[in-house]
Amino acid sequence: MRIGLFAVGRLKAGPEKDLAGRYLDRFAKAGPAVGLELARVVETAESRAANAETRKREEAGQLEKALADGSLLVLLDERGKALDSEAFARLLGTLRDSGKRDLMIAIGGADGLDPALHARADAVLNLGKMTWPHQLVRILIAEQLYRAVTILSGHPYHRA
């Protein structure tokens, strides 16, 4: 299964981008052994619309353009379901085994995600009850993707 990461906003050069890149590289190298590969990272500019609803709608339009036909969609949202690392790995394994070729994991903008995306999503997850800056969310999901691959492959990186 090809996994893409969609993010509203761009990571500037610096330690956050380096760390996210390091985990995505690890995922890209280890993932094929368990049938997961990094397809792409899509960054889109934040909408400059005057109100939050319009911004969310415009950002959702950018995500829809980035989705492959028939792609699965997982949203990262504060109102989503919290999973531990092993449950996240199981979810990725289940989605991989669904027969779908593509999965997009989406990080919304500062205003959140459009309700239409929630209706279309195959899963909505959160990374805990705390609010995280988007730069750190990228690092966290990149690390969790790598960790999921190590769990699925039985690698000792994850020591529960």
Swiss-Prot record:
<feature type="binding site">
    <location>
        <begin position="127"/>
        <end position="132"/>
    </location>
    <ligand>
        <name>S-adenosyl-L-methionine</name>
    </ligand>
</feature>
<dbReference type="InterPro" id="IPR029026">
    <property type="entry name" value="tRNA_m1G_MTases_N"/>
</dbReference>
<comment type="similarity">
    <text>Belongs to the RNA methyltransferase RlmH family.</text>
</comment>
<dbReference type="InterPro" id="IPR003742">
    <property type="entry name" value="RlmH-like"/>
</dbReference>
<comment type="subunit">
    <text>Homodimer.</text>
</comment>
<dbReference type="GO" id="GO:0070038">
    <property type="term" value="F:rRNA (pseudouridine-N3-)-methyltransferase activity"/>
</dbReference>
<feature type="binding site">
    <location>
        <position position="76"/>
    </location>
    <ligand>
        <name>S-adenosyl-L-methionine</name>
    </ligand>
</feature>
<dbReference type="InterPro" id="IPR029028">
    <property type="entry name" value="Alpha/beta_knot_MTases"/>
</dbReference>
<dbReference type="GO" id="GO:0005737">
    <property type="term" value="C:cytoplasm"/>
</dbReference>
<keyword id="KW-0949">S-adenosyl-L-methionine</keyword>
<keyword id="KW-0963">Cytoplasm</keyword>
<keyword id="KW-0489">Methyltransferase</keyword>
<keyword id="KW-0698">rRNA processing</keyword>
<comment type="function">
    <text>Specifically methylates the pseudouridine at position 1915 (m3Psi1915) in 23S rRNA.</text>
</comment>
<keyword id="KW-0808">Transferase</keyword>
<feature type="binding site">
    <location>
        <position position="108"/>
    </location>
    <ligand>
        <name>S-adenosyl-L-methionine</name>
    </ligand>
</feature>
<protein>
    <recommendedName>
        <fullName>Ribosomal RNA large subunit methyltransferase H</fullName>
        <ecNumber>2.1.1.177</ecNumber>
    </recommendedName>
</protein>
<dbReference type="Pfam" id="PF02590">
    <property type="entry name" value="SPOUT_MTase"/>
</dbReference>
